[in-house]
Structures are given as C-alpha cells and as structure tokens.
C-alpha cells in the first residue's frame, strides 16, 4: 500500500497502467466530477 498515489491525478496515471491497487479508486474517480 505504501508508495501508491492517493490523489486523483496520481490515481489516473496508475489507472492508465491498470494498477490493481488503484483500479478501484479510478472507478470511483470516474463516477465523480473530473477536474
């Protein structure tokens, strides 16, 4: 869990690489307003 970005931008970047840890967060971010 350490070393993984928890903010939206960082999560988007890891999501592009299909990061398994950030995948769930990316789904939540996609349902929220993207800024």
Swiss-Prot record:
Main localization, broad class: secreted
Domain LCN-type CS-alpha/beta: 1-35
UniProt record similarity statement: Belongs to the long (4 C-C) scorpion toxin superfamily. Sodium channel inhibitor family.
Gene3D superfamilies: Knottin, scorpion toxin-like
Superkingdom per UniProt: Eukaryota
Intracellular or extracellular location(s): Secreted
Physiological role: Causes paralysis and death in insects (A.domestica).
Domain notes: Has the structural arrangement of an alpha-helix connected to antiparallel beta-sheets by disulfide bonds (CS-alpha/beta).
Tissue: Expressed by the venom gland.
Keyword Disulfide bond in record: yes
Gene Ontology MF annotations: sodium channel inhibitor activity; toxin activity
Organism expressing this protein natively: Rhopalurus junceus (Caribbean blue scorpion)
GO CC list: extracellular region
Key words of the record: Disulfide bond, Neurotoxin, Secreted, Toxin
InterPro entries in alphabetical order: LCN-type_CS_alpha_beta_dom, Scorpion_toxin-like_sf, Scorpion_toxinL/defensin
Keyword Disulfide bond among record annotations: yes
A Pfam family recorded for this sequence: Toxin_3
Protein name: Putative neurotoxin
